[in-house]
Amino acid sequence: MAERKTPLHKVRNIGIAAHIDAGKTTTSERILFFTGMSHKIGEVHDGAATMDWMEQEKERGITITSAATTAFWKGYQVNLIDTPGHVDFTIEVERSMRVLDGAVAVFCSVGGVQPQSETVWRQANKYHVPRIVFVNKMDRIGANFFRVEEQIRERLKANPVPIQIPIGAEDNFKGVVDLVRMKAYVWNDEKKPTDYVEEEIPAEVKDKAEEYRAKLIEAVSETDDSLMEKFFAGEELTEEEIKKGIKAGCLRMTITPMLCGTAFKNKGIQPLLDAVVDYLPAPDEIAAINGVYEDGTEVTVESTDDGEFAALAFKIMTDPFVGQLTFIRVYRGSLESGSYAYNTVQDCKERIGRLLKMHSNKREEITELFAGEIGAVVGLKNTLTGDTLASEKDKVILERMDFPEPVISVAVEPKTKADQEKMAIALQKLAQEDPSFRVSTDEESGQTIISGMGELHLEIIVDRMLREFKVDAEVGQPQVAYRETIRKAVEQEYKYAKQSGGRGQYGHVFLRIEPLPAASGFEFVNDIKGGVVPKEYIPAVEKGCKEALQSGVLAGYPVEDVKVTLFDGSYHEVDSSEMAFKLAASMGFKEGARKAGAVILEPMMKVEVETPEEYMGDVIGDLNKRRGQVNSMDDRNGVKIIAAYCPLAQMFGYSTDLRSMTQGRATYSMEFDHYEEVPKNVSEEIIKKRNG
């Protein structure tokens, strides 16, 4: 049994979460540099950042997969999980949020709170991830720390509490005032750009520092009654008391500590690392996570080395040298290489091959992983993202992650027959890595269909097939994932009876079919009294309804948000069978749903466009042409922000159109928001197209 090197209270599992251009990868890089793990600093500008280790990321300069990296700072082990900042990859963000204990939210001092930041912030709230804010790019023209503070309060509805304020901004950004110690840290560029000196607070920011120190003390005093008493008695709080108060508020998420700097110029990173170890939680300081047993009994899993092993597989990657890597977060107990673990979701035993700690794309072999740690396992056969690995003595299932349903599909075909098999293997591996990506076969055309969260998502999948698996694929036109639903309640009787010599078939059902609120899925209720339909046939009725849902009513799209109640029927002693009841239910459902005002639903995307004012009219006119509904118009740093809902069907190729309309000066972000009924004329077109 290996010994634990870092005690649990000195472990920090953190993520760097941010909008696409806030400088997240650069910040992660600098953290690795200052913690001594990385010798040549990688720059995103020249495509060499250690964190971005997949080729497409290097080209696009956006971070796609969360690489988990272990670094050390002042005796603390910091496991850094890099999260993507582009909306097509929200699944990756969700997945990393699930295993983080704390996060550093990076904002650009010029761009402030971007639409994407709101999505990431919501996800962090959902998983109760305490966070600190780092306002980056303080050296840029238009940098304004205090405006970002205001935006966090207004747009994210958080309580930002600066624990530093900047000294100067733009070209004059020299350093920061530490409001806890009331000292200035100044980076003198000429000497070593990474080193800073501690000085007295410069006269020009003294008043501002006093004002913000008072705000900090007030916020801190609200976290604890004894501090509140001292505050009202006018007594000074000690440095230790202030730190304790900041941490308490941060863990309860009533305070969001704010720091600033410029990662690119190496300013502000050391104090940021100090804040990570001082204010973000250790694994044993966060709430225990919930698990269930197979019989539905709930249980809480405390973060501790004692007790039976339990871990969550949160990421699967294919590494060109080692094969498949499964990243796990250990919540309880420990795991040794060469041992066995039980996958409680797939219900099978897994042999643990080698255990690795990853440093971006370098790896270190280890013999054991302990509670609170993150590492990668080589050689797991059946484990998927979101599965639990546990001890056979305590088969707990840790809470599952929710994965969104794909909204866009394209048909792919290999360019040569020889690639057919290679493509199937490639797609299977990619689908294992990414649960928001699905592969299916179109029954009518026999084509392979891939589905995902957006155009960029699928582009990158096709790109990876070529690079990693050497499969060159032709890609068809994007198809929208429409759905169907009903608008009114109906009752439907259906009798399925066949008598043609020998044993017949007999199934007879009465179904009540009703609409449910949006995003409710499917609900089946058995309301049979007096055994008019025997118990053993009820599951067949439900199965028949479910199968009918899949093939749709109007145009063959899946039906959702429907409740079906089986309330009457009859059976035949000899001729009734599961098959007969399944068919009766399936045909009955289809017939009933047609009378229940069936409609087609389409995915609506939340679109935000940032454009210079002179193009605003064109952009809005174009969105209206695409059946968009403009919700709001806003000013942000001299550019106009247009927020709208648009049907996905109208948004293909939007980036190219927007570029030509605004001479490349506008940017946009788009994510799936909800399903909405399509207008009648569009519905008729869809039905005509589908039914040929």
Curated annotation (Swiss-Prot):
Keyword list, A-Z: Cytoplasm, Elongation factor, GTP-binding, Nucleotide-binding, Protein biosynthesis
Cellular component aspect of the GO annotation: cytoplasm
Alphabetized GO MF terms: GTP binding; GTPase activity; translation elongation factor activity
Disulfide bonds listed in the record: none
Superkingdom of origin: Bacteria
Subcellular location: Cytoplasm
GO terms under biological process: ribosome disassembly
Residue stretches making up the tr-type G domain: 9-284
Predominant location: cytoplasm
Residues given in the record as GTP binding sites: 18-25, 82-86, 136-139
SUPFAM superfamilies membership: EF-G C-terminal domain-like (SSF54980), P-loop containing nucleoside triphosphate hydrolases (SSF52540), Ribosomal protein S5 domain 2-like (SSF54211), Translation proteins (SSF50447)
Cited Gene3D superfamilies: 3.30.230.10, 3.30.70.240, Elongation Factor G (Translational Gtpase), domain 3, P-loop containing nucleotide triphosphate hydrolases, Translation factors
Pfam families: EF-G_D2 (PF22042), EFG_C (PF00679), EFG_III (PF14492), EFG_IV (PF03764), GTP_EFTU (PF00009)
Coiled-coil intervals: none
UniProt entry tagged with the keyword Protein biosynthesis: yes
PANTHER family assigned: RIBOSOME-RELEASING FACTOR 2, MITOCHONDRIAL, TRANSLATION ELONGATION FACTOR G-RELATED
Function: Catalyzes the GTP-dependent ribosomal translocation step during translation elongation. During this step, the ribosome changes from the pre-translocational (PRE) to the post-translocational (POST) state as the newly formed A-site-bound peptidyl-tRNA and P-site-bound deacylated tRNA move to the P and E sites, respectively. Catalyzes the coordinated movement of the two tRNA molecules, the mRNA and conformational changes in the ribosome.
NCBIfam families with a match to the protein in the record: EF-G, PRK12740.1-3, PRK12740.1-5, small_GTP
Family: Belongs to the TRAFAC class translation factor GTPase superfamily. Classic translation factor GTPase family. EF-G/EF-2 subfamily.
Protein name from the UniProt record: Elongation factor G
Protein source organism: Campylobacter concisus (strain 13826)
Designated gene of the protein: fusA
